């Protein structure tokens, strides 16, 4: 008998998932001039959710005050969530990450294209990484 202790960490998690359940996580990262605004974040998150065919469980929320000029946004979707974090840099730019987590697969390339268009990111200056894909055992 195989126990989860005999498996690699990603296999351990996959074994614990309900049959047929999957989890997909990815990150989009870029730098931009200036700072994000709450309105920009809300609009972007709503557009991204629609583009990916997801459903909002609640209106996107904004967190402020965790650092000077820093804003974070969270879109609670019915299949998990999407977060956007802005990290102000000493040179006046902002490093931004968008994390997409869902139990349904999604088009990461489409998400990256919307992100580049929305925030004016030049070609070659946006990074995408599919950080985790776990496929639960099938019944």
Name what the model sees in each region.
Residues 1-139:
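Polybasic/polar functional segments that serve as interface/processing modules
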């Amino acid at each position: 008998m195989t126990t989860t202790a005999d498996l690699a960490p990603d296999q351990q998690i996959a074994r614990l998932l309900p049959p047929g359940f999957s989890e997909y996580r990815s990150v989009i990262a870029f730098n931009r001039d200036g700072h994000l605004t709450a309105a920009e974040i809300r609009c972007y998150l709503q557009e991204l959710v629609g583009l990916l065919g997801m459903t909002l469980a609640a209106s996107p929320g904004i967190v402020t005050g965790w650092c000077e000029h820093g804003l974070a946004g969270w879109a609670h979707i019915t299949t998990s969530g999407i977060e956007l974090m802005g990290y102000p840099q000493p040179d006046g730019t902002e490093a931004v990450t968008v994390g997409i987590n869902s139990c349904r697969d999604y088009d990461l390339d489409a998400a990256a294209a919307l992100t580049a268009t929305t925030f004016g990111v030049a070609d070659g200056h946006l990074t995408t990484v599919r950080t985790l894909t776990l496929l639960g055992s099938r019944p």
